[in-house]
Amino acid sequence: MTNHFIGIGKYIPTEKISNLFFEEHQFFNEQGEILDQNNATISYKLKQITGIEERRYARKDQVTSDLGYMAAASAITNANIDAETIDYIIFAHNFGDVKHDTIQSDMVPSLAARVKNLLKIQNPYCVAYDVIFGCPGWVEGVIQANAFIKAGLAKRCLVIGAETLSRVVDEHDRDTMIYADGAGAAILEASTNNKGIQAHLSASYANEEKDYLFFGKSYNSEKCPNTKYIKMYGRKIYEFALSKVPLAMKKCVDDSSYNIDDISKIVIHQANEKMDEAIVKRFYSLYDQDVPKNIMPMNIHKLGNSSVATIPILLKMIMDNDLENHQINEGDVVLFASVGAGMNINTFIYQF
């Protein structure tokens, strides 16, 4: 038995934030020293490396669960189902609801419970819980939903990925420019024609890799040292991803009934354009092949890195023909992959 998506939804915040937004920021390095480069140079290098020209921020009156609700409602409409028939709501995020101009995370009750409330679902046996798994959280939620359905514990699951990273960034850290807000969702149920999830794989590296992404103090030493922000060791993450993610993708393909030539698209977490390109190039090199043309759709240029939301948003955009030269047709085999805090990696193969 395989399980497939019957509805996909997204919510892209309306606030467009270009790189010009950061021109007046004062950036420091990890030692608390003001960066020598001017902000125009920093912005130029950011675009060259990550591909990011602009990103989206949630409105001041919105929090992560609001974004997740909008994406969930979109997926339910797309599936044309009664929300009361959903057995599980799995909400992937990392920082809970953080109100504008605060840094305190609110995770009780769970964001999944908040979405269930907003959807007005009365069924008490619709179970709502959160997944904290770094950027791969939405993919992991899909893998868990797949397991629930296969085990006979559910017939229909709603998996949400949403984040408001703009609320947890250090304005004095140039990495702030990478992060964005957004939400995506999908509804999974059993397939009658063996289409859907064909194979999957997850891994956690939690030794020296554990703190490659972490919560740390501002680079501005004059700020309150007890206030924490999202921080990362970019070079270490890049090297880790390039080393581990292609191998995981290959193992997933090799453990399935497909081969590398069957893959129509690779939908990968929108973390960094150069890193994603390097991962896919390394993946194909493991098969002694060049990267096929138009294999990897991207939306990071305009939407930035919204963590768990990047993959479902990207998938919805492809399905809606919103990306030039990227379509998914019936029968296509798509490889999904993500990497993030933990450090966690996951991947699954899906036939449409």
Q: Model segments located where?
A:
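Conserved beta-ketoacyl condensing-enzyme motif
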Residues: 5, 61-132, 258-277
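Conserved catalytic cysteine-centered active-site region
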Residues: 39-63, 98-156, 282-313
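Short, well-ordered amphipathic alpha-helical segments that serve as non-catalytic structural scaffolds
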Residues: 41-42, 65-79, 111-112, 240-256, ...
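A contiguous, well-structured pocket-lining segment that forms one wall/lid of small-molecule binding clefts
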Residues: 226-300
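Catalytic phosphate/nucleotide-handling subdomain of diverse soluble enzymes
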Residues: 316-337, 343-352
